[in-house]
C-alpha cells in the first residue's frame, strides 16, 4: 500500500470552503481516493461544487444527517486496509508535510497493536478565553486535544 492509494473519507455537512481546501490539499499531495460522506447537506454552493468534482473524488450522499460516529462506521465497514477519516474542517496548515499520510503509515507500522494515528491539532491558536460565542467550547477543546500531545513524533 502506498500513501497515495490510502482511501480518505471526509465527513461533511454544509461546509464548502474548508472542504474545498482540504480536497485541494489532498489532491496536491497525490491522494488518489477521496470520498466525501455527506450528511444531508442543503447548502446550494456546496451541492453545485459536488457536481463539478471528478478524478478521484466521490461523494456518498447519506440521505440523512447520520453524524460523525455513524459516518465512521460506514467508512470502516467499507475498508480492510488502513484508511483516513477526517472532518471537513480539519485543513492542514501550510507547514504540514505533503507526505502526512505516509508518515502516519510509518507510525502504524512501527506501533504494533495501534489502530489509529493522526496529526495533532495546533493548540497555540485555539482561544481559551470565552471572548465570543463562537469560541465557547475553547477550554474543553484545548483540554481534550492536549491528551494527544504527550509524545511528539516527527
Residue positions per predicted region:
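Short, well-formed alpha-helical segments that are part of the catalytic scaffolds
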Residues: 15-28
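Conserved catalytic core of nucleotide-sugar-dependent glycosyltransferases
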Residues: 67-69, 76, 91-154
Amino acid at each position: 500500500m502506498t500513501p497515495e492509494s490510502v482511501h480518505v473519507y471526509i465527513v461533511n455537512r454544509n461546509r464548502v470552503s474548508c472542504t474545498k481546501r482540504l480536497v485541494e490539499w489532498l489532491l496536491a499531495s497525490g491522494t488518489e481516493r477521496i470520498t466525501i460522506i455527506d450528511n444531508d447537506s442543503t447548502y446550494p454552493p456546496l451541492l453545485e461544487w459536488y457536481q463539478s468534482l471528478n478524478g478521484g473524488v466521490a461523494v456518498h450522499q447519506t440521505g440523512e444527517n447520520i453524524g460523525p460516529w455513524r459516518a465512521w462506521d460506514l467508512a470502516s465497514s467499507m475498508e480492510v486496509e488502513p484508511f483516513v477519516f477526517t472532518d471537513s474542517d480539519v485543513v492542514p496548515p501550510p507547514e504540514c508535510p505533503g507526505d502526512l499520510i505516509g508518515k502516519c503509515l510509518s507510525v502504524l507500522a512501527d506501533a504494533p497493536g495501534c489502530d489509529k494515528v493522526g496529526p495533532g491539532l495546533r493548540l497555540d491558536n485555539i482561544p481559551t478565553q470565552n471572548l465570543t460565542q463562537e469560541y465557547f467550547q475553547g477550554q474543553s477543546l484545548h483540554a481534550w486535544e492536549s491528551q494527544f500531545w504527550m509524545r511528539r513524533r516527527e
